Amino acid sequence: MVKKVLLINGPNLNLLGTREPEKYGTTTLKDIEMEAHQQVAKHQDAELFTYQNNTEGFIIDRIQEAKQQGVGFIIINAGAYTHTSVGIRDALLGTAIPFIEVHITNVHQREPFRHHSYLSDKAIAVIAGLGVYGYTAAIEYALNY
């Protein structure tokens, strides 16, 4: 049986590599996705889907589609929606697909409004502050889940 993993990136993550490189580094989202596909390709029984959107409703739609596709694990960096979106939280809960929340920076070292996540209490794990390596760690976990 093929393990299907969905990697979702939210608003402004399409700007990685150029957006505040002192915080987020110079690695682009395309680089992250390419590395993720290479990592998953080492496992013959795994498939990776990647998705990025700046619009909350489209992210919710993609989470709901994941259930229909038989996705068994979601890795999500919801970006700013982490701190505001009950809708994304409800979509994740509604599909009952296990997920890991990933953040490139340590959100707890940043502005106070970034300290609260609508996702973390329901996530299997939260990875924050490891830079883009957080995606690698999350994928490794998902593949062995």
From Swiss-Prot:
Keywords, comma-separated and alphabetical: Lyase, Quinate metabolism
Cysteines paired by S-S bonds: none
Site feature location: Transition state stabilizer: R19
Gene3D superfamilies referenced in this protein's UniProt entry, alphabetically: Dehydroquinase, class II (3.40.50.9100)
UniProt: substrate binding residues: N77, H83, D90, I104, T105, R114
Enzyme category, top tier: lyase
Pathway assignment: Aromatic compound metabolism; 3,4-dihydroxybenzoate biosynthesis; 3,4-dihydroxybenzoate from 3-dehydroquinate: step 1/2
Catalytic activity field: 3-dehydroquinate = 3-dehydroshikimate + H2O
Gene Ontology terms: biological process: 3,4-dihydroxybenzoate biosynthetic process; quinate catabolic process
UniProt-listed HAMAP family: AroQ
Quaternary organization: Homododecamer. Adopts a ring-like structure, composed of an arrangement of two hexameric rings stacked on top of one another.
Protein family according to the UniProt entry: Belongs to the type-II 3-dehydroquinase family.
Protein name in the entry: Catabolic 3-dehydroquinase
Source organism per UniProt: Clavispora lusitaniae (strain ATCC 42720)
